[in-house]
Amino acid sequence: MSFTDPIGDMLTRIRNASSARHEKVLVPASRLKVRIAEVLREEGFIKDFVLHEDGVQGAITIVLKYSADREPAISDIKRVSKPGLRRYVATDSIPRVLNGMGVAILSTSKGVMVDREARKQKVGGELICTVW
């Protein structure tokens, strides 16, 4: 478990569980992680998630999504902005992931959102990760 990069830890758990064809994955909770899970659900990369409150930190159970032949909905998920090297992008330099087939998740002043929404609202921010 990585205490220096909790978002990277969450993404790695999702990537590993997905490649091992697990149905669910449990990650420690935070507001940012919950919002990332919401974005992944809205974009159709995960089925659902459940937030477990325990009074301290809580946990998130993420239900992974697979096709009929058990191929994961998430082909790859990569951390872009890391604690040692933050990556911020302006509106005009938000990357297109696989020419629009994937999404980039950004943390902006208007909340956590995907690249299309950030371009539409004309906001830049920290490029958290890319998913396809």
Curated annotation (Swiss-Prot):
GO terms for molecular function: rRNA binding; structural constituent of ribosome. InterPro entries: Ribosomal_uS8, Ribosomal_uS8_CS, Ribosomal_uS8_sf. It comes from the Bacteria. GO terms for biological process: translation. Keywords: Ribonucleoprotein, Ribosomal protein, RNA-binding, rRNA-binding. GO terms for cellular component: ribonucleoprotein complex; ribosome. Pfam families: Ribosomal_S8. One of the primary rRNA binding proteins, it binds directly to 16S rRNA central domain where it helps coordinate assembly of the platform of the 30S subunit. HAMAP family: Ribosomal_uS8_B (MF_01302_B). Belongs to the universal ribosomal protein uS8 family. NCBIfam families: PRK00136.1. Part of the 30S ribosomal subunit. Contacts proteins S5 and S12. This is Small ribosomal subunit protein uS8. It comes from Anaeromyxobacter sp. (strain K). The lineage of its organism: Bacteria, Pseudomonadati, Myxococcota, Myxococcia, Myxococcales.
